[in-house]
Amino acid sequence: MMHTYPVLSHPGSITPFGLLWRIACGHGLNKWPFDGLIINKLKTVSVVATTLVLLNNAAIARCPKNLDFTKRFLASEQSVHLCQAYAGKVLLVVNTASYCGFTGQYRGLEALYQQYREAGLMVLGFPSNDFLQEPRSEDKVREFCSLTYNVKFPMFEKTRVAKRHADPFYQALANQSGDYPRWNFHKYLLDRQGNVVASYGSSVKPDDESLISTIESNL
């Protein structure tokens, strides 16, 4: 009697595995019919994996140039490609420091993040010692941000941001905005397409009406 079983790589179709088994035996391949089912399942997994890789490569190929960078998380060995992680989000990119008169802005930045994150806003913090106010190790910076301001938004490796020695990511932001950070807590706002739509100096607080209005208009 010939039995039929569904083929996983072709949902809804039926393959006569009894026939497959008899043909296999006739060629000296004494295999049980379920071997065919397993083979088809493995083929399906392979096709899915290949498709995911192709989609991922295509997404990177379409990545906005301002986000085409890989950055390491603060005090971590884990890195992330900014485009893969944050493409399609509105981004507020801020260079931070622990010993600055503007350090209290951490609290406002976290409030912004919590208020608008579900709508698509991401705040990205980049500690920098370019202005000699972040001498701490990355471990100490992370501890300070967590214990003092309960920072939950993503924080990244210590980064050069000033014009003369700026990190390539900050060079890209400055080239489009025409404005390099002159002090700690400079803010770049990027739209969902990865374009810099606004640049704010250190004195512009996270609860500034103009900043909030521009964020909301881009969400």
Q: For each of these PLM feature ranges, what is it?
A:
Residues 177, 182-219:
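Thiol-/selenol-based redox modules, centered on thioredoxin-like
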